[in-house]
Amino acid sequence: MRRASLSVLCMLGAFWGSVLAAPQRPNVLFIAVDDLACTLGCYGDLIAKTPHIDRLAAGGVCFERAYNQLPLCNPTRASVMTGLRPDTIKVYDLDQHFREEVPGVVTLSQQFKNRGWFTARVGKIYHYNVPASIGTDGFDDPPSWEKTVNPK
């Protein structure tokens, strides 16, 4: 009886040890910024004082090269979030929504959401009329988020 109890206790200990040692999913913070140049400390700028962004970059991924297909925020962001080129999703300007051309496309945030991550949008990801639409959902994509926050 003692051996059986000891065996069960050892198995439970091994099980809980493996559960506790299992890697946890990382937090993912996607920051989309309008008109941000590389004048940040994490990119080697000696004048800019950006300690908070620098700390985020040091603990995550700092991209060294960036490209976009069109010099406007809406087509570029729609392309990044869908993984499709602007000519595929027919978004060339600020007043077009990618769902009109590809209604069933799964966005990057939906990929995370479908795999159990909590997804939220704070501020602008796609496009809205500035300043009139600040504080609204604007040109958003509701299937992509569980929660939205619209700063004023």
Locations of regions flagged by a protein language model:
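Formylglycine-dependent sulfatase
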Residues: 2, 18-152
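Bacterial N-terminal signal peptides
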Residues: 7-16
